[in-house]
Regions:
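Short, structured active-site "lid" loops
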Residues: 60-70
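Lipid deacylating catalytic domains
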Residues: 1-62, 82-122, 126-285
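A hydrophobic C-terminal alpha-helical subdomain
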Residues: 70-84
Length: 285
């Protein structure tokens, strides 16, 4: 029987639905006999954006001469993701709302196995902002405050449209991260989204549970991966920043400079995997 849920959220750029398979395999290897007590699910929202991005990329390749195709494609998909998620997010059916719907559906599938079990979220890159906004909106709705965008503006209406029925109280709590025991962020770029805000408007999520622990892994050479403790508003008390060498310590000066590989390699890092496994082991034991 499942004792704890692992929910992953992918980052920016072209992403296959199998993006978390490698991480999950490594975690199962470290968990050993406890692996059967962990239900593992991955949120996949890239399909909302990818067809349009592919269309623009192919048009560019066919009708223009551009250099650095791999880096250029990463920028197009990555920053296209960020722009798409934030643009007109208050509109019903926005990318922001659809992405939140994917998180909710993934959580519902875990809840069906064991209501109320603790959840460990692992989010990469842009997924950190997507998940943070989702939890922030859910907590705001739970306090009875108005939410301006996304499914938590009216979670009951979303449920009726998406799954054809009302949510139970247990499901609503679970979908709102009410049993979240841990959050691991890697290559997090939340600071990019909030840096232009006035200091008094920079407000992190609240601790969902008394067990809650947030570890943020970043590589100092990764310009898209940021520390969170320097942020105002309570991040210093909420988050533990940890430095890793996600790029693998390659010797070449060129390769040590930033590249998409270094940004997308956190889940291959032994230190990151060991930390996630330790969290799951503690909750499943």
């Amino acid at each position: 029987m499942a004792d704890v849920a692992l929910i992953t959220v992918h980052g920016m750029g072209e992403t296959p639905p199998t993006y978390a398979d490698g991480l999950m395999d490594r975690l199962r290897g470290q968990l050993g006999s406890l692996a059967g007590q962990v239900v593992m699910r991955s949120v996949y929202y890239q399909k909302i954006l990818q067809d349009n991005q592919n269309y623009v990329w192919e048009r560019t390749r066919e009708h223009s001469a551009v250099r650095y195709p791999d880096l250029r494609k990463f920028v197009l998909f990555g920053f296209g993701d960020a722009a798409g998620l934030e643009n007109r997010k208050e509109i019903p059916g926005s990318v922001y709302e659809l992405a939140q719907g994917e998180i909710a559906r993934t959580l519902l599938s875990a809840h069906a196995l064991r209501p109320g079990m603790p959840v460990v979220f692992v989010a990469q890159s842009l997924g950190c902002q997507v998940l943070s906004s989702y939890i922030y909106d859910a907590q705001k709705a739970a306090r009875g405050q108005p939410v301006g965008a996304g499914i938590w503006r009216n979670i009951d209406a979303w449920a009726l449209a998406a799954i054809g029925r009302a949510l139970t109280a247990s499901e609503k709590t679970f979908l709102g991260a009410g049993t979240c025991a841990a959050l691991v962020t890697t290559g997090c770029n939340i600071p990019v989204f909030i840096a232009a805000h006035k200091i008094m408007h920079i407000i992190p999520i609240e601790r969902p549970t008394s067990l809650f622990k947030w570890i943020n892994f970043y590589d100092p050479d990764d310009v898209l991966g940021w520390p969170l403790q320097p942020l105002p508003g309570g991040y210093n008390e909420l988050v533990e920043d940890r430095i890793v060498n996600a790029s693998g310590g390659v010797a070449s000066l060129l390769l040590r400079s930033w590249n998409p590989f270094s940004h997308n390699s956190y889940w291959d890092d032994a230190t990151v995997v060991a930390a996630i496994a330790a969290m799951l082991r503690r909750l499943a034991a």
